[in-house]
Regions:
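Conserved "right-hand" nucleotidyltransferase catalytic core of DNA-directed polymerases
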Residues: 151-259
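Structured helix-beta-strand junction loops
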Residues: 7-9, 60-61, 214
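Short conserved micro-motifs on helix faces and helix-strand junctions that flank
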Residues: 11, 86, 141, 186, ...
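Hydrophobic/aromatic residues in well-formed alpha-helices
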Residues: 1, 93, 107-110, 193, ...
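N-terminal accessory regions of nucleic-acid-interacting proteins
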Residues: 1-15
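Active-site-proximal helix-loop-helix substrate-binding element of RNase H-like nuclease domains
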Residues: 21, 25, 29-160, 168-172
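Short beta-turn/strand-loop junction motif enriched in small, turn-promoting residues
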Residues: 16-20
Length: 259
């Protein structure tokens, strides 16, 4: 079955993991789909050499169609796996096309929106660490790659129609770097951070004391109490959000609240 994937032009790729942290959790299943072969599920617990087995596929020039590719790539990079070829991220494509609209971009949302199919996600949070997976889990995992290529076809046409292919390519090309950056993280001086947080806490306490001295014993985190207390000292406001308070920032007590 795997040999047919090595000559495919496009491959749907997904993984099921035991959790969300590539440093602590493991890949349990890898799922593949293509136009000309049945979906392929690879049990990483049962096949110890799955990385070597799939290396030719990872290195192939086939377009890798992945939903939220950054997640998969972080797990792969942690294991020393480099994915070659173009990545088409269905989640990023959907987000680009929906810019300005309050739409959801989970895989099930896209499948329903573009393919009019409702996915069963009941196994999404099930136990993927058990030695024997249930048939319902395997069906769920297969379903996750079943619709990637049909989505790719729909989204690619939408991107072309909206003249967004170049910006989409730019987004897809950055996924590798973003995944590597998030996986690597950055160094942090914990001692200096703790010192800074203590300074902020002291400043916050000082400002709160000054506000209470001006307005009386109130909960400064309560917009209702704050508005009433300001009214009592002659400061009439429509609300206590930052936009309204900024209009009166010249007043010392309001300045302290903003700080």
């Amino acid at each position: 079955k795997l040999s047919s994937y090595l000559t495919a032009d496009e491959i749907g790729l997904d993984i099921e993991t035991t959790g969300l942290d590539p440093y602590k959790d493991q890949i349990r299943l890898l799922q593949l789909s293509s136009r000309d072969a049945p979906n392929l599920l690879i049990d990483a617990y049962a096949i110890n050499n799955w990385i070597d087995l799939l290396k030719p596929l990872f290195k192939s020039s086939a377009i890798k169609i992945i939903h939220n590719a950054k997640f998969e790539l972080k797990f792969f990079y942690h294991l020393g796996i480099d994915i070659k070829g173009v990545i088409f991220d269905t989640m990023l494509a959907s987000q680009l096309l929906a810019a300005g609209y309050q739409l959801k971009h989970k895989l099930s949302d896209l499948v329903e929106r573009y393919l009019s199919i409702e996915m069963d996600k009941s196994e999404q949070k099930s136990d993927w660490n058990q030695l024997e997976l249930r048939s319902s889990q395997l069906a769920y995992a297969s379903n996750d790659v079943e619709y990637l290529i049909p989505l790719y076809d729909k989204l690619r046409l939408e991107l072309r129609h909206n003249k967004m292919r170049k910006v989409a390519k730019l987004e897809f090309d950055t996924v590798h770097a973003v995944a590597q950056m998030e996986l690597a993280g950055f160094g942090l001086d914990r001692q200096r951070l703790d010192q800074y947080l203590n300074q902020l806490a002291a400043k916050h306490q000082k400002l709160e004391t000054e506000i209470i001295n001006k307005l009386g014993p109130i909960n400064v985190n309560s917009p209702k109490q704050l508005k009433e207390a300001l009214f009592k000292v002659g400061i009439i406001l429509d609300g206590t959000n930052r936009e309204v308070l900024n209009q009166h920032a010249e007043l010392p007590v309001v300045f302290n609240i903003l700080e």
